[in-house]
Amino acid sequence: KKRVEYMKSKNLNVINVIEKNKPKYDFIYSDQTFEHIGDPKDTLELLNSSLNLGGYILLNFPSSFGFKRKIKNNYTPSKDEAHPLEHLNLFNRSSMNYLIRNTKLKLINFRSLNSLKLRDMYKDIKNLIYFDSVLLKKTI
């Protein structure tokens, strides 16, 4: 909200692409954007309000695999999960469950590097190393 107000103060036209009373969707896809959002819970609730009952949200974001170990070992930014520094959030199964708490969304699938079998790693090596994904379903 602060950023929106700042942009408006600079005479920039700010458009909210998801507004109330707009069409509902069966599927919403977000690729490499959620880690940049300052308030992912509010954004997720906004996306949820734009879903039909039984609709899905698919989110892809950088993997946080191994990041906890990095910050325990005198972490300095380099090109990784949290850098460039505009990556405001990292997600894992636990943080995603926290985000969807008290929403009408159910976590259907969480694919992460540390949950894959070795034989699956060869299917799409780039995405397996760098990106996790979560599939959510609107249930009520």
Task: Label the predicted regions.
Residues 13, 106-109:
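Conserved beta-strand segments of alpha/beta enzyme cores
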Residues 80-84:
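Glycine-rich FAD cofactor-binding loop and adjacent beta-loop-alpha segment at the N-terminus
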Residues 72-76, 108-140:
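A C-terminal cap/extension of S-adenosyl-L-methionine-dependent methyltransferases
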Residues 1-73, 85-102, 136-138:
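Conserved SAM-binding loop
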